[in-house]
Design a protein with these regions (language model features):
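Phosphate/nucleotide-binding beta-alpha loop and adjacent structural elements of enzyme active sites
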Residues: 1-157
């Protein structure tokens, strides 16, 4: 279910008193944490098998998306590793702060130049949220998919 279509969840996210329920829902219930967690293609399994079990490493996850679902560092975090998670979506960072408080979680965009950028949301939690409107047009033309652009939402500089 998309969060934006749920009247109950839209109510819950408006009131700070309920924000922890909203985060819990997005981390554990919505994404079936008990069935599907960790990276999409098992990248972290290779990294963990490369080091011995006692090794507690560090990581940087740029474009971290979600604390458990399709996340390349979730199993490393559960194994005692600690790191920095960076994403341009404020909701993503709030979810990381809730689920992974021992990490450093930063709401920022990474760029090779300093300029104001507009953030375009495809959906509240989506891997295609972007700073580039052209990227959404490319996806629409190449994949023949319709995207609703909710942005501009935030200005980054």
């Amino acid at each position: 279910m998309k969060t934006s279509k749920s009247k109950f969840l839209n109510f819950v996210k408006k009131y700070p008193l309920f924000k922890n329920f909203y985060y819990f829902y997005n981390i554990y219930i919505r994404n079936y944490k008990f069935l599907n967690n960790g990276s999409q293609f098992g990248e972290e399994k290779f990294i963990l098998s490369f080091f011995n079990k006692a090794h507690k490493g560090k990581f940087v996850d740029i474009g971290c998306f979600h604390p458990t679902r399709h996340n390349n560092t979730y199993k490393m975090y559960k194994s005692g590793w600690r790191g920095i998670n960076i994403d341009l979506n404020p909701l993503t960072i709030n979810l990381f702060n809730f689920a992974r408080p021992k990490d450093i979680n930063i709401n920022a965009a990474i760029s090779d130049n300093e300029e104001n950028k507009t953030l375009y949301f495809v959906d509240e939690l989506n891997t295609q949220n972007t700073l580039e409107a052209n990227h959404l047009l490319f996806l629409k033309n190449q994949l023949n998919q319709e995207y609703i652009i909710h942005g501009p939402q935030h200005q980054y500089s």
